[in-house]
Amino acid sequence: MSTAGPLKSVDYEVFGRVQGVCFRMYTEGEAKKIGVVGWVKNTSKGTVTGQVQGPEDKVNSMKSWLSKVGSPSSRIDRTNFSNEKTISKLEYSNFSIRY
């Protein structure tokens, strides 16, 4: 992965109709396409949560996708981002679905 610019890390939680609509699978695919690492999982309260890490521009692209696009049959009401920070190195080697 090219590290043009600072590396960023951000936590996210997506609200809406995001479970049972292949949201995690599409999130993993989009993350790999953009070139970010991290993870995604369903929560017990019906949301999807996770973390994204990578070059700032790629993290911003993923944030936009998590806020506006999602999987084809999902309906995103809102996405909360928290704990956004600059990191010195990536903590993950890929993007994965957690269970």
UniProtKB/Swiss-Prot annotation:
Subunit relationships: Monomer (RA1) and homodimer (RA3); disulfide linked.
EC number(s) on file: 3.6.1.7
Residues found modified as N-acetylserine: S2
Domain Acylphosphatase-like: 9-99
The encoding gene: ACYP2
Active site residues according to the UniProt entry: R24, N42
Gene3D superfamilies found in the cross-reference section: 3.30.70.100
PTM sites of type S-glutathionyl cysteine: C22
Protein known as: Acylphosphatase-2
